[in-house]
Amino acid sequence: MKKTALVFLWILLASGISACGKQASAEGSGSTVTIGVVGEAQEMWDPVKEELAKEGINLELVTFTDYSTPNAALAGGEIDLNAFQHYAYLNKEIESYSYEIEAIGDTFISAMNIYSRNLTDVSQVQRGSKVAVPGDASNEGRALKVLEAAGLIALDKKAGDSPEAADIVDNPLQLELVEVDAANVCALLPDVAIAVVNCNYALDNGLNPGKDSIFQDSVDIYEGKNYVNLIAAGKGEADNEVYKRIVEAYQTEAVKEVYKEAFKGSYLPAWE
C-alpha cells in the first residue's frame, strides 16, 4: 500500500514538473523553437533571431531542400513551425494530405515585376507588342493580374486571383502573349517589348527587382491571400504566446529593410 502511494505521489510530482516546463516554454524563457525554411533564408531571419534572443527565445532554422518535406515535418512534430509557402500551396497540401497545420502569421509576397530591354515605362508599350509571361497556370495568372494593374489589359472579375488568357475581356493594344516556362521568360527580353518575371528568375539573370523593373508588383493587386507567404504551426497553436511573439518579431521594419537591401526588393511585406 505504501509503495502504491509513493508511486502515485511520484506521478503527481512528475506531472507538476512537466506543467511547469510547459509554462516556461509558453513564456519564452529559455525555450528553443525550430522553424523549417527552404533555400537561402538566413539573412531574412537574422534580425528576428537577434530580437528573440534578448527574450530568451532561441529560434533555430531547419533548412529543407524541397517543398514537399516541411509540411510533413511540421505535421509530424519534427519541427515547431515552418515558413516557406503561400496560402494557395498550404491549402493544396492540407487538401491532399489532411495535415493538421494552419497559418499563424503573414510574411511576404514574392514580387513579379515587368521588365524591358528598351522601354522605361509601361506607357511606352506599343500596339501589337509581344509580352512574355510564364506559361504555367499559377504564374501566368499572377502575370495577368500584374498586366491588368499596369493598365495594359482588363480581366473578367469572376476569375479572381487565378485568371487565364481566356479571361482577358479588354486588350486595347492588341498585345500578343508569349507563354514560356517561367525560368525562360528572361531569355526572351531581347525579342519582346516587355516580360513579366518571377523575382527569383530576375535575380538569377542579373536583374534588380527594385531598380530594373518598369512596373512593380504590389500586395494590393490581389483580392485574397493566395500568393501571400506565411508562418505555419500545428493546428490549434495560433494562441501559443512564443509563436505569437515570433510572428511579431518578424513583422518589423528590420525585416523590411532586409527585403530591400539583401533581396533587392524581391519580397513585398504582406502584413501591413
Residue ranges and their predicted role:
Residues 111-122, 226-240:
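A bilobed periplasmic-binding-protein/Venus flytrap-type ligand-binding module shared by bacterial periplasmic
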Residues 1-33:
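Short, low-complexity disordered leader/linker segments with a strong preference
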Residues 40, 65-67, 77-91, 181-182, ...:
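Beta->alpha turn/N-cap motifs
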Residues 140-148, 250-271:
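Periplasmic-binding protein-like
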Residues 92-104, 118-119, 191, 196, ...:
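Ligand-binding "clamshell"
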Residues 61-72, 160-187:
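Short helix-initiation/N-cap motifs at beta->coil->alpha
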Residues 104-153:
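A conserved helix-loop-strand patch within extracytoplasmic ligand-binding domains
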Residues 27-40, 57-63, 130-131:
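Short, well-ordered beta-strand elements
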